[in-house]
Amino acid sequence: MKQDFPKVIFFGTPEFAIPSLKALVERKIPVELVVTRPDRKKGRGQKLSAPPVKEFATEAGLECYQPETLKDPEVMEKLGKYESDCLVIVAYGQLIPRELIEMTPLGAINVHPSLLPKYRGAAPIQRAIMTGESETGVTIMLLDEGMDSGPILSQEKIAIKSDDTLGILHDKLAQMGAEILVDAIKNYYRGELNPVPQDHEKATFAPAISKSECLIDWTRSSEDICNLIRAIDPVPGAYTYWDGKILKIFSPRVEKIELGGKPGEVVEAAPHGLLVATGDGIGLRINEVQLAGQRRMKFAEFARGKGKKLIPGTILGGE
């Protein structure tokens, strides 16, 4: 007799994966094993730190396994001991070998934070904001040997608001993914959901954000710069140079007024923010900053301290 729910092995590592694992546990999907990345040294003290998924799984009483690489033959042997129906992959952080994908009857079900086939790759949330998309979403899909190219089981859209940052949208999509994952798993297990192949001709890609992309080019349009800042807030953070130091920029707002300043020129330094000229002649209001070695703060607070020298006529950029 077929059981009501499929037994799964869960692969995940960062905060994004926790809502999905929590949903599986709360909805009574049997999680046989949690596979996550090894503990790593972090911070100035280089203390050994467990991945967020391991911390949650341990509190939930789930068994954890932390292989250095999935290509080790011992991994296949270990996972083969569990009579699981499928693998569930949520931001594990390493490619899943074909041998593992094929080891269970249902294969590997993946949660991807974009509307595939758009934004395949490592940074779909960042790229969607950066390019000025008005919507994004979550796709539940089957893994194949390609990069996010497998058939789709389920998909849900969400609007990208003008003040959404990477951090805000990350949390929204993590929760949305968890909510549609469980139903997709159950329906696919029961044979009530047919995978739909992606249209590969419509595929776009979302490579990881490089350090050079984080440097603000003030000759670009106000909208482009605003989107960049939101797309990498809180980390790694968009930055410029001021007084020979790195100055990270947060909480931007496009001001629909034409300014006469040069790109990167401070036009106004007021309690409600720094107004900077951009390449299209439109102002960008900056409400939060973080000088190298300091904490993030409102511009009004910064202006009372080291930011006193950041006055109209100052040119941001360069080194």
What are the language-model segments listed below?
Residues 5, 26-30, 37, 86-205, ...:
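Donor/substrate-binding cores of folate-linked one-carbon enzymes
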Residues 13-16, 68-71, 92-94:
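Short beta->alpha connector loops
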